[in-house]
Amino acid sequence: MAEEGVFMKYTLAPSLLAADFSELWEELSKAERAGVRFVHFDVMDGSFVPNISFGAPIIRSLRKRSQSFFDVHMMVEEPIRYLEDMKNAGADRVTIHSEAARHLDRSLNRIRELGMQAGLALNPA
């Protein structure tokens, strides 16, 4: 609970995973027209999690047309392998899972070295 006189600030970042993949730009554009300024990308490799989703090429092509903040959630094994690709694709923040990175400290430091914000996802199970 917030202290009296302190306001909590929340940011909503809709995930494009729920979008129609054949119309990603149209879906993102519609969200931006509605006021969305943060967009969440769930990047899955089919190994860390069973599904496969976006990769750097899709993020890069949407970045060319969008000024929104790109929040990239890496659900992949050894995310450090993909960090430069995410930077070059236009990610503003990259969140990784502690259990997916052999050297968590190196991965988080590398995200920051590349000029992105670093996030850490914890599995509550």
Annotated model-derived regions:
Residues I52-V72, R110-G119:
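Alpha-helix-loop-beta-strand connector modules within alpha/beta enzyme cores
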Residues Y10-S15, V39-F41, F70-M74, V94-I96, ...:
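Hydrophobic faces of well-ordered beta-strands that scaffold small-molecule active sites
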Residues R33-F38, Q67, A91:
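A structural motif
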Residues M1-F7:
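Short, Lys/Arg-enriched N-terminal segments with co-localized hydrophobic residues
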Residues V39-A56:
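Glycine-rich, proline-tolerant flexible connector loops at the mouths of alpha/beta enzymes
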Residues L28, I80-N88:
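Catalytic cores of alpha/beta
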Residues L24, A31, D42, M86:
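Conserved, mostly hydrophobic/aromatic
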Residues D20-E23, R65, R81-Y82, A91-A125:
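Conserved anion-binding
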